[in-house]
Amino acid sequence: DEGYTIVHVPPILVDERRKNETHPEKSDSLDALGVAKVILQRSDTLLPYTVTPEAVKAKQIKELSMDREYLVDERTRLKNQLHTILHRLWNTEYRVKFKDSFSLKALRYWKARTPKSADDFLIRSMRRKVSRMLDLHNEIQELEKELETLLEESGHTIHTASGCGLTIAATIIGEVGDINRFHSPASLAKYAGCAPRECSSGKTKRWRKSRSGNRRLNCAFHRMALSQISRMGNNKAQTYFKRKVSEGKSKSQALVCLRRQMVNIVWMMLKHKTIYDIHRND
């Protein structure tokens, strides 16, 4: 409100500057000095930070998206633990009793029925884990409903793109924040670590895959690109991928190229709040 420009200073830049000192020291005052020096030297590369309605909504989406990830990770850990317990109780029979051993129907069955000769300790442990699994299922569903509501309120429609479901769309919107921070698809690609970094010397021109950038955003674009070349993906992406392979690139390199194209599409959709149009050529 006072007319000041606020920028986001990644801690890694301050840390790198401190490590380059002859005698690296750390304190709050030195950190503040390091932040000021980074701003003076790299102001043209730092992203602006603005509190807009779009940024606030994106932050809410990010928090819900991360909450969902934590719950899904917990559910995965419980599944692995239950595998061991169910195998000890039913041997290999538990795998053929249900198509999905961890469906709601299966979980309720494991909780209600146990082998007569089973150890009481194992039964109690199994029931605790099954109860938590059922609770997690309900909590994840509630979070997904909230995410759907927030995505609808945001006005963004990137979930209409093939290979971009609810979870990927929520991750992208949450990590990008206000799309107006990024003046071009290239700046978004660099932020996400989807832009190649130059490693040239003399007449030799080389480009390598970037391992920096926002890793959650990078992973979301990677999963989106993988979906594009799956059997259920779209033909244009598959044709582009095959063309890159025919040009001499490895499949992993071709996938990196496709991921960069996904950034272009997502930037355009976020910038103009348009739905995905597979027939567009730009």
Protein language model features and the residues they cover:
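Phosphate-backbone recognition surface of nucleic-acid-processing proteins
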Residues: 159-160, 166-251
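Glycine/alanine-rich phosphate-binding loops at beta-alpha junctions
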Residues: 1-6
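Short alpha-helix plus adjacent loop in nuclease-associated cores
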Residues: 7-50, 204-212, 229
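Glycine-rich, often acidic, oxyanion-interacting loops/wings at catalytic, nucleic-acid
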Residues: 59, 64-157
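Short, charge-rich amphipathic alpha-helices with coiled-coil/heptad character
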Residues: 41-61, 112-115
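Short helix-capping/linker segments at secondary-structure and domain boundaries
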Residues: 42-47, 78-79, 137-141, 177-181, ...
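Acidic, carboxylate-rich catalytic segments that either coordinate divalent cations
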Residues: 232-282
